[in-house]
Amino acid sequence: MAMDMDQRWVNRLPADMLETFHWFRGECFSLIVEDVLRLPSEPYVIVEGFRLLPHLVKPLLAVSSQAIWLLPTPEFRQAMVNSRRSPQWGFVEKTSDPERALGNLLERDAMFTQRLYEEAQRLELKTIEVDSTMTVDELARRVAEALGL
């Protein structure tokens, strides 16, 4: 049975939202791999997305330095949502309590980010924490350094 918008975004705990969100479980990861394998390997291929879970990516790497996870701080994520409050976020407006729905979503995302961090650390994969004080140029420099570019 499908949930209505309040059941999905307002009335559930963010932890329950995280545990039941299928994309955070690697669903469709194999389709991403198929797409990436069709791309030319030169000069470089950068792949991003929350379906790229460290435990799924690591076995595909020749060396662990080929991958890095950019992990937003909760403050960065909030700033991005505030700056992009666009139709993309319109689904929260379809709830009876848009602010709570958005808060739940942000909390779920923060828990997911923490899970990614812990998994990457356990697997000895690189991460960069991204906060709202970091410039695009600084982030690009740090990514290039981490990837040895």
Language-model segments: what does each one mean?
Residues 19-33, 100-118:
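Alpha-helix-centered segments that form part of catalytic cores
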Residues 61-66, 123-125:
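Short glycine-/polar-rich loops that comprise or flank the Walker A/P-loop
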Residues 43-47, 65:
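Generic beta-sheet signal
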Residues 36-40, 58-64:
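Conserved catalytic network of the ASCE P-loop NTPase/AAA+ motor domain
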